[in-house]
């Protein structure tokens, strides 16, 4: 006899074979605020559908303040990893250069708009750390796969933080499935 479909036991049995149809029937949409660089990584997950905030139509003041990226040292053993041991003096020097670059980029963007250049052209000078919003919709199965994959070692720190935030929302929205996956 099968357990009732709404019980944790059913969810647990289904999680063992999470590719089954039961996880294709429910979906979740999240708004994710990130940078253009990380959004490009997220958009590669093809089992989701996406809508990204268009900088083409945004006013320049809507683009937000560009935050300095967290500079880390390249891991010498794993090319997909970074370490938090960058020399503080090197970090400080590079951050000062980034501030100058980002300010110059924003000024050039604003000047291009004032000169009548189309926003779709002017946005090309904006840094990859310009903030953006994406709306990400996927099935329960897609979210399980994404969260497991992007919470794992080897994922860029900023992307991993997004995956962990997605896991938090997922556990609130799908508590029985999360319990079966031992995410709680």
Question: What annotation goes with each model-predicted range?
Answer:
Residues 4-5:
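ABC ATPase NBD coupling module
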